[in-house]
């Protein structure tokens, strides 16, 4: 699955609420807003001054395989493996406190457990980040609750 986005403006700059943000919903293995340009004091990011600014361009490719776990079907469990690669870049106006790398493609791999429950499908993702920037925020576990129509 491939997903991308591009913001363009004829006048002015993008606002932070218009920009794209990447995290576990689009790219597994990373925290919400965990990838992309950051506002950091003196171009040094720490846990207390590491605000995500979003980006005007993004691209993500997600590869996934789902398979049975070899247990009875009435349990509603299956497994999966995934590999995600993506990037978030570009800000129209940059000040000296913005830190980011334009061409740095982040990568994550992991395993998933899918569980069909009466409240809806649950998905447990266990991730390992293969490539990231020092200021990115990653996560090793993610739980997704879906609905069925």
For the regions a language model picked out, list residue spans one by one.
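Conserved active-site loop/cleft motifs that coordinate metal ions or position small ligands
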Residues: 78-82, 121-127
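A short alpha/beta connector and helix-capping loop motif
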Residues: 94-113
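Repeated loop/turn-to-beta-strand initiation elements of outer-membrane beta-barrel proteins
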Residues: 71-73, 115-124
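Short basic/hydrophobic patches in alpha-helices and adjacent helix-turn junctions
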Residues: 65-68, 111-116
């Amino acid at each position: 699955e491939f997903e991308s986005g591009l913001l363009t403006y004829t006048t002015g700059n993008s606002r932070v609420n218009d920009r794209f943000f990447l995290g576990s919903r689009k790219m597994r293995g990373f925290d919400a807003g965990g990838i992309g340009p950051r506002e950091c004091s003196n171009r040094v990011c720490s846990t207390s001054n590491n605000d995500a600014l979003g980006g005007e361009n993004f691209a993500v490719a997600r590869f996934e395989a789902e398979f049975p776990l070899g247990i009875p079907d009435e349990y509603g469990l299956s497994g999966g493996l995934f590999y995600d690669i993506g990037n978030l870049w570009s800000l129209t106006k940059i000040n000296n406190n913005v830190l980011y790398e334009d061409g740095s493609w982040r990568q994550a791999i992991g395993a998933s457990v899918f569980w069909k429950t009466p409240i809806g499908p649950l998905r447990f993702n266990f991730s390992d980040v293969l490539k990231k920037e020092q200021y990115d925020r990653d996560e090793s576990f993610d739980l997704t609750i879906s609905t069925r129509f």
